[in-house]
UniProtKB/Swiss-Prot annotation:
<feature type="binding site">
    <location>
        <position position="192"/>
    </location>
    <ligand>
        <name>[4Fe-4S] cluster 2</name>
    </ligand>
</feature>
<dbReference type="InterPro" id="IPR038135">
    <property type="entry name" value="Methylthiotransferase_N_sf"/>
</dbReference>
<dbReference type="Pfam" id="PF00919">
    <property type="entry name" value="UPF0004"/>
</dbReference>
<feature type="domain" description="TRAM">
    <location>
        <begin position="416"/>
        <end position="479"/>
    </location>
</feature>
<dbReference type="GO" id="GO:0051539">
    <property type="term" value="F:4 iron, 4 sulfur cluster binding"/>
</dbReference>
<dbReference type="InterPro" id="IPR013848">
    <property type="entry name" value="Methylthiotransferase_N"/>
</dbReference>
<dbReference type="InterPro" id="IPR006463">
    <property type="entry name" value="MiaB_methiolase"/>
</dbReference>
<keyword id="KW-0411">Iron-sulfur</keyword>
<comment type="function">
    <text>Catalyzes the methylthiolation of N6-(dimethylallyl)adenosine (i(6)A), leading to the formation of 2-methylthio-N6-(dimethylallyl)adenosine (ms(2)i(6)A) at position 37 in tRNAs that read codons beginning with uridine.</text>
</comment>
<feature type="binding site">
    <location>
        <position position="117"/>
    </location>
    <ligand>
        <name>[4Fe-4S] cluster 1</name>
    </ligand>
</feature>
<feature type="binding site">
    <location>
        <position position="196"/>
    </location>
    <ligand>
        <name>[4Fe-4S] cluster 2</name>
    </ligand>
</feature>
<feature type="binding site">
    <location>
        <position position="83"/>
    </location>
    <ligand>
        <name>[4Fe-4S] cluster 1</name>
    </ligand>
</feature>
<dbReference type="Pfam" id="PF01938">
    <property type="entry name" value="TRAM"/>
</dbReference>
<feature type="domain" description="MTTase N-terminal">
    <location>
        <begin position="38"/>
        <end position="154"/>
    </location>
</feature>
<feature type="binding site">
    <location>
        <position position="47"/>
    </location>
    <ligand>
        <name>[4Fe-4S] cluster 1</name>
    </ligand>
</feature>
<dbReference type="Pfam" id="PF04055">
    <property type="entry name" value="Radical_SAM"/>
</dbReference>
<dbReference type="GO" id="GO:0046872">
    <property type="term" value="F:metal ion binding"/>
</dbReference>
Amino acid sequence: MKQVVQDLDVLPAAPTAAEKAACDLPRITEERNTGKQRKLYIESYGCQMNFSDSEIVMSILTEEGFDTTSTPNNADVILLNTCSIRDNAEQKVRHRLVHFKGLKRNKPSMIVGVLGCMAERLKAQLLEEEKIVDMVVGPDAYRDLPNLINEVDSGHKAVNVFLSREETYADINPLRLSGDGVSAFVSIMRGCDNMCSFCVVPYTRGRERSRDAHSILNEVRELVANGYKEVTLLGQNVDSYKWSAEGTDERVNFAQLLERVALVDPDLRVRFSTSHPKDITDEVLYTMKKYDNICNSIHLPAQSGNTRILELMNRTYTREWYMERITKIRQILGDDCGISSDTIAGFCSETEEEHQDTLSLMEFARFDFGYQFVYSERPGTPAAKKLADDVPEDVKQRRLSEIITVQRQLSLEHNQAQIGTIQKILIEGVSKKSEHDLKGRNSRNMMAIFPKKNYSKGQYVDVLITGCSGGTLFGEIVETV
């Protein structure tokens, strides 16, 4: 699962250096001042699951006497919710920690802590060797934060990176990071059992466990009651969601959960992320087709287009299997279904011919957009232990550039095909480029920009698409008389 930064007139799959820096910006806490004694500041990096976790942390700590601030200098507690998926993500956090260590010189009582995947992976280095944090807290230990903060207040370092087989935070009502009141993340499961050879997630987030379906539906109903118009169901692999009620015959798989959420309110848009190609079922696809409010968009990471490389990655499917899934999606949901992907360039021992297989798979699938990176070896993973990271860096970068070029063209063609059509858009807010324009997305997850007129966020509007760039649609609201 990768970070999505809205309102950028760029293609997420293919950023320039400046654009990529913008896409990697963290989400930070907003100002909330209710007169409480202490201030909390959180920076959240990486995937949507991290953003969702930060909302859980905010909820826990606001119950313990914290307001939130958007300014680190004003904070009593600074928390970085971190990502370990790539080395540069970790380096970015390290630079921020050094900066916050400087702030502590002027405010010695300030607590600096690391949450999330880096906490689990680098606890000893961060606490004992580099001495740049006061507290290290893993993804399953957020309930313990009040105790850990008290420990630091008492003059000690604090750590809890215990991985749970049960924790889902099902009973905690998240405090939303985004104040737009339109879209919200709803976590439905935690952890991952897939054990891809390149990935640290199973080691930093633990094994899969699914959240109580009733608590998910209660959270969705509360969001609707509070005026939210869109939810995104989150998990490292949502299609493997399986929950059963203890002592009863009730069993709920992902397709059934998706249907239950769709039935909460026909005006509530429902998205989900991320899907593993081996687990997305025809039942899920037919459920999407059945309900108009389930968005016609699927994030289906391919990672590579070559079967040998996929086997080395332990993805448990072949090129042909992935292509069959794409064909089935098109058969059931039509060519209007938006499909996006993740791709790794230059994985261990990848040949030029195997790289060409990835390019041809992209052409076959015709992805709307994607997130693509060069392979970054992560210590402790099976790939790091058993495979040589032997593709030269300049070759990785050249292959990434070729992947980006193909994706830019595919995305532009998809957007050009929308010109002249009328799209139902959910308004998410004012465009960052012009206060006179609004921004919003269609069911296919395409961003559109259009003149504001008398409309505002949270409304659905019909927009006639009149133009596009590689990453954005442009249009005019069609008003019915």
